[in-house]
Each structure stands twice: as C-alpha cells, then as structure tokens.
Amino acid sequence: MARGPRGAKGLAEGDRLMGRYVIALDQGTTSSRAVLFDRAGRPVASVQRPFPQIYPQPGWVEHDPHDILSSQLGALTELLVSEGLAPDDVDSIGITNQRETTIVWNRLTGEPVCNAIVWQCRRTTEMIERLCADPEVARRITATTGLIPDPYFSASKIKWILDNVAGAREAAERGELAFGTVDSWLIWTLTYGRVHATDVTNASRTMLYDIHNGCWDEYLLDLFGIPASMMPEVRPSASSFGETSNPGLVQGIPICGVAGDQQAALFGQCCFKAGMAKNTYGTGCFLLMHTGHEACESSHGLVTTIAASAPGVEGTEYALEGSVFMAGALVQWLRDELGLIESPAQTETLAKSVPDTGGVYIVPAFTGLGAPYWDAEARGAIFGLTRGTGRAHIVRAALEALAYQVLDLVVAMEEDSGITLSTLNVDGGASANDFLLQFQADIMDRILKRPRNTETTALGAAYLAGLQTGFWRDLEEIRRLGDIGDVFSTKMASKRRHELIDGWHEAVGRTRTRRP
C-alpha cells in the first residue's frame, strides 16, 4: 500500500483531517505493541506480540534483534489489517522503546553482529569498575552525561561487542558498523536503511552523550574505544525520522515522534513542567520528575536525563530519574521460576488474602540494586521465612517490595530537588493492581493518581508524533485530553508505616556489598 505525498509539518486543515489516527509502536523488554490512537487520545485498538528472553549466563540478558523486529513489525501489520486501515487513515507513527539496550549491525547488510545486549545485563560490571577506578573519570562521566557509571547504560555494552565479537572492531574502524538503541534499529528497518538516527532522550541514556552541549562526547567515545562513525544522528523527540519504506509495510507514513519509554510516559502523563512526576510500573520501575531547563544534580544516586519536549520548545528540558531493575520482572519470576502464580492478575487476590507478609521481605536484587544504592554485585534475597510462611505471604512481599523501592526513590528525589511531591502520577501494567497502589500510597504517605488510560508510554509517543504533524495543535489541547481515573490516599497509621520501612531498610542492608 502507498499513500499520497505529505509533509511532516505545516499541514493545512484539510491535510490535518486526512489521517484519522496516530500509531504508537511500543517496543518493550518482553513484548512489542502497536497501539492506535484517535484524536481524543483514546486507544482504539492494540496488538501485542511477546518475544523470547535469552539468558546465556547468570546476570547476562540478551534479545535476538530479529525477534524484536518480527514482533514489532508483525504487531504493526496485524493492527493495520485487523482494523482495515488504508494508508491515509494513519497520520503518523511515534516510537517508544526499552532504553539502553544495545544493537550493533552491519550498514551494508543490515545484519546484527550479535544479539542485543539488554539494559538489565550486568556482563560489563568489571569493565566499568576498571575504567572508572580513577575517581576523576567517574566524575567526568557524571558531569557530562548526568549518569552514574554503570553497566546499565549503553557505552560499556558497545565496547564489549567490539572487544568480543570476532571482526567487530576492525569493521567498526572501517565505518561498516552502526550502533543504535532499539529506536534506531526500528527506524533503520522501517525506513529501509535510509535513516540512522535516534532522539535526545535515548541518546541521553548511552553514557556517551553530552546532555549540556547536545552532542556525542569525544572524550567518552575515546574512553570506551568507540568510533564516532558508529553513532546515530541525534534529533529532537518531536521531529522527522523519515517515513516507512520497507517492502511489505504500508509505504510513506511519517515517523515523527521518538522517545525512550520512561520519557514517553512522562510526556503521556502531561508532566510538562518542573516538579511534575510520574512512576511507571513496567518490567522495571521508573520514577521521573520534570526539572524544567535545569539539569539537577543528585547526591543520592539518581541520574539526570533529558525529557522529551514538544515542537518549538526552546532549549533542552531535563528530568531527574530513579530506576528499579526488577518490578514486573519480579512478578514474572514468581510465575515462571517459582510457579506461585499462573498470571500477574492473581497477585492482587493472593496479597489481599493475608493481613500482612508475616514478616517476610523480598529484596529483588537479581541483577543488582539500582538507585539510590547502585550496587551491581548485590543479589536477591528473601528474609523472614518461617514454617508458617505460605504462597500468599511471598506474593504479597513481592508486591510490597515494588512499593518500598519506589519509596526509596521518592525520598531521594525530594531531597535532591528540594521539591516535596504531594502527588505521584502512576502508569504501566502493574498499576492496574489496586493492592499495589494502595500499599504504595500507604507507605509513601502521598496521593497516587492513576489515569483511566494507563498506556501512557504509547500515548506519549503518539502525542509527540501528532504534535509534530499538527494532528494535535499544542500542549494545551493535549492537557484537555488528560483524565484521572482513580485516586489512592494513605490509610496506614504512621507508627505501622515506620515499622515496615525500618524492616525494609534492614533487609536491603543485608544484601548490599557496598556500604554507605
């Protein structure tokens, strides 16, 4: 299918009415989705396709880049066919993606040189420790990128590929290899190799991007031994990224919005101003607070990152971020490895079936501890087991562990920013769990707001694309589309809250290999 020529900006009113929908491609850690949004910002239809996880060694996590593509393009094609969409029904495409996950491919053949190294993978821990043994190097990385040196980010993953895949470094030095986070890989494929680009939010997660000057940093590229020719062009989140040109796909749909999943969720929650915050309960757990044009420095192990901006916004907008590595992945572990549940939906009923955890705490440090601890060598543990501990206690402890980790982030973020969060917007798959959100409100002593449409990550990507084309006029129009579905406020006594928090901190302390 083909569509008539259309520009990505400055559309006349008649052109604005040509496309009835915006499609968001939401490429996540465990599945790929295509979501169709109408002008009211409502998800009209969606298709989701899971793909396999690969665990070659303990602490290592990989994806086959072809699985990412087949699941994402398959979801897009199925959505178009199932909804009977003609090419001109679609105004534009927005892309949001799992961040940091690293793919290196041959520019000539389009073939990856190896599996993607996933954001959760810890194989480069020793490399990071060796490179950053000099405190001045670690300080410079943080000052330039806003990030704390960690295997989580892309830089060390690229170096590992160049150092360990036969012929990769030589090919890279000849200019034959391209690096990209998942957004770049999708854009390259959708445009049939015509566009090698990323957006500022994904670039800011590589540990190679100067977030203050808006460019790839030569010192960091040299530190990690990465040829500059591998790097994608960096564009604003709302801008033109080419159009679909891959044979077998709908031709000529503009790709006009790209953002990493957490920045997309911040945008989808309409957190456009300093002090507005959201938490996404996905595979990981991610708390972001918009800090406006100020790149706020953290003394609590949080990172400074770039926020997605609407078209026409002058200057760079920033966010303060804290991340938890295991959130939905912890629930997946309960199902797949322990066999305690058949589906995530069961966790709410089981958690409510007991009055408390019976003193059980789970510290889900399966791939290390994220902010505010940043202990890559910590490992998961369950504390407080007795003969009376049952399945429900362990499931409840897992859900409570998610909430405790978010609490740690909120406390650190408030201290770093000087802003007290009275309200936290929430989204992501696990936000459908009422028990989790009520316990979160209880343990934080804060109000939580959950929108009726919890697919705010995909919505953020759609908003960025639609604002770029004129499908939506401006931020004010988008704000009016926002909705609040449910509000959760604390019901827990202060004494009980502090007892539970003290127990959590004791459990975390027993898993840590790095002491404060």
What spans do the regions from the language model cover?
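Short beta-strand-loop/turn "lid" adjacent to the catalytic site in phosphate-handling enzymes
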Residues: 81-119, 145-154, 187-210, 235, ...
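Short, conserved phosphate/pyrophosphate- and ester-handling motifs at nucleotide-, phospho-/glycolipid
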Residues: 64, 121, 261
